[in-house]
Amino acid sequence: MSSVRPYPLPGPTYGPAAAFPSGVDTVKARDRRGRERAISGNRLTSWAFAEAYGEPDAGTAEGAALRWARERAEAAGVRAVSPGTGDALRLLAAATGARAVVEIGTGTGVSGIYLLQGLSPDGVLTTVDVEPERQQFARQAFRMAGFASNRARLIPGPALDVLPRLTDGGYDLVFYDGDRLECLECLGESLRLLRPGGLVCYTGVFAGGRTVDSGPQPTEVLRLRELLRAVRERKDLVPALLPVGDGLLCAARA
């Protein structure tokens, strides 16, 4: 499998195979290399700062709930959104004035806490997961974060069975963190649920860099590529691919 640098810097490739040719001022060349490394380091530091920027203090109820939910996710081997992705979800929910949100893939409640933070005070999160045990963790995390029980509706079951039962055009935002093999099939259902101007968001679309890797990839990565292409080509969507966490694909329904 080939490796990919998602943010390549301009300039020469350095390493054993890229020695300075004769006649080159090696002092200046090494200075340039040092500057490029500094730029790369500054970018990584900036991205790390941005990822942690909006994370609530661990001493608050929401911060403690997020930490607890992340620990449960790690123990269960469940993907959880990064703090930067959570910040983006909270912002998008708040910016759209969302009162009704669907989440596909409850997990242990990490992303749900961010979405509830961004929802209007009377807003409701409808969250779907095939594993009821995980939803029990999420329910406890929401309670720890201070959200009333009527703010979240947890529905167990496969997404493709549950989504058709939800109301057409009744939601402001649909967030997908479910089975990557079903991401494309769930797109149509997600758009049906959205009001005009509503948002659909998919997390994890970089797949750890594999989405843009030219080497052989598993089926789930191929499905993510199909999803990215389908969203970009639809005339009724306004898409953006945000470089937060493991990639957040968002699209507004025109």
Where are these regions (language model features)?
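A short alpha-helical cap/connector motif
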Residues: 1-173, 180-201, 205-254
